[in-house]
Amino acid sequence: MPYLLISTQIRMEVGPTMVGDEHSDPELMQHLGASKRSVLGNNFYEYYVNDPPRIVLDKLECKGFRVLSMTGVGQTLVWCLHKE
């Protein structure tokens, strides 16, 4: 899976950061220290970490990922990363 989306809401300085969905690479999620959860009302699982996005981006860079784009939608910030 060469593409990855991460996101955070409201305050990017403190986290949590959403780092994957139920189809994400388990080995990568373990490297990030992510936990899998299902939020009440959602019919899907997501992986999250308590780290702020900057820490997550640093960890992903060590795994060969590079940021392609970043945007803000309402109070949510989203980064799209790619691994060659």
UniProtKB/Swiss-Prot annotation:
SUPFAM superfamilies: GTP cyclohydrolase I feedback regulatory protein, GFRP. GO terms for molecular function: enzyme inhibitor activity; GTP cyclohydrolase I regulator activity. It is found in: Nucleus; Nucleus membrane; Cytoplasm, Cytosol. One of its GO terms (biological process) is negative regulation of small molecule metabolic process. Keywords: Cytoplasm, Membrane, Nucleus. Its main location: nucleus. Homopentamer. Forms a complex with GCH1 where a GCH1 homodecamer is sandwiched by two GFRP homopentamers. Interacts with GCH1. Mediates tetrahydrobiopterin inhibition of GTP cyclohydrolase 1. This inhibition is reversed by L-phenylalanine. This is GTP cyclohydrolase 1 feedback regulatory protein. It comes from Mus musculus (Mouse). The lineage of its organism: Eukaryota, Metazoa, Chordata, Craniata, Vertebrata.
